[in-house]
A protein has these predicted regions:
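A conserved cap/lid and substrate-binding interface adjacent to the catalytic center
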Residues: 38-150, 165-187, 192-211
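N-terminal low-complexity, Ser/Thr- and acidic-residue-enriched intrinsically disordered segments
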Residues: 1-47
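Aromatic pocket-lining residues of Rossmann-like dinucleotide-binding sites
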Residues: 162
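Gly/Ala-rich beta-loop-alpha elbow adjacent to hydrolase catalytic centers
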Residues: 150-155, 159
Length: 211
């Protein structure tokens, strides 16, 4: 079972993944140190943001986290790969429905047209898999590495689907509440609403994966 400390750790990582840390249009990557602190302080420019004290602890150069990669695609998919400088953990976090530029795309194209109609966010899943493939092929990212996966809301749906696509690799799991995944053609639910926390050894969501 996850400890309170572990739950807080993954919740903080999920919240940090909501921040806009990679801005290729202006050549800015706020992946570590003061830049990362500023990025997670801004968060998603709405309610998901860190206090100064929280941000400094999260990005502490000796015990905290850095960002190895963040992507955002035209389907609204966004993922962030984190690395802990003390424990050497890697965590892959999928962002929830975005409230700014991707709001209409996430809610209409993904949530209404794909999830409600077909059970899967197909466009974002395709982008998730393509991005994961590049990470898994790179030893500096996820190649040969054990890592954890988190997701919230739409990101929870993606984390669930990520696990379903590689059931044999999952050892344990946790995530925050997410959208339901698809139903069987016969009407039975394949994966229902995500529970508040998927506990260790619960294979309904991923924790430790090794590509």
């Amino acid at each position: 079972m996850l400890t309170t400390t572990e739950i807080l750790k993954f919740a903080n990582l999920q919240m940090a993944s909501e921040a806009l840390l990679n801005k290729p249009e202006i050549g800015e990557r706020r992946y570590s140190g003061d830049a990362l602190i500023a990025g997670i302080r801004e968060g998603n420019n709405r309610s998901l943001k860190f206090t100064q004290t929280q941000a400094q602890a999260f990005a502490d150069p000796n015990t905290g986290w850095t960002v190895l990669a963040q992507t955002s695609t035209t389907t609204g998919f966004s993922g962030t790969l984190f690395y802990n400088t003390k424990t050497f953990e890697r965590v892959l976090s999928f962002r929830s429905t975005e409230f700014i530029d991707d709001h209409a795309r996430d809610n209409q194209a993904t949530n209404a047209m794909e999830l409600a109609e077909g059970g899967f966010a197909l466009g974002q899943i395709a982008d998730m898999e393509a991005w994961y493939k590049t990470l898994a092929e790179n030893p500096a990212m996820l190649g040969g590495k054990t890592f954890s996966v988190t997701g919230y809301s739409l990101g929870g749906h993606l984390a669930t689907t990520f696990n379903l696509l590689r059931q044999q690799e999952a050892q344990a799991g946790q995530a925050l509440p997410g959208a339901p995944s698809a139903k069987h053609s016969g009407g039975g639910t394949a994966v229902g609403d995500f529970p508040p926390i998927c506990l260790a050894l619960d294979t309904s969501c991923p924790k430790h994966l090794n590509p």
